[in-house]
């Protein structure tokens, strides 16, 4: 929930309660950050954020998150493929070692 939604909701509540405009002004001034604080030297304490640096920071965060996500996905994929290949080769190794028993031929001939 952002601050503007909160402030507009409070404004509407105050307006419906038929309070004076002075109460409305003090409510808006204390909550939404629009009230300026002036120091002894005449400067203001409210700093306007540099939107460009915020945008660049967000883009870098998104790029790093995408790279890390792709790294994890490819790691899981290649690990799964490697395990699949190893299990397949182990199955083939076991199949080659198995030889039919001599008794199998006798049973087949005995049935006829």
UniProtKB/Swiss-Prot annotation:
InterPro entries given in the database record: Reprimo_fam
Membrane-spanning ranges: 59-79
Intracellular or extracellular location(s): Membrane
UniProt keyword Transmembrane, yes or no: yes
Disulfide bonds: none
Example of a GO cellular component annotation carried by this entry: membrane
Keywords for this protein: Membrane, Transmembrane, Transmembrane helix
Membrane topology: Single-pass membrane protein
UniProt entry tagged with the keyword Transmembrane: yes
Family statement drawn from the similarity comment of this UniProt entry: Belongs to the reprimo family.
Name assigned to this protein: Reprimo-like protein
Organism name: Xenopus laevis
Gene: rprml
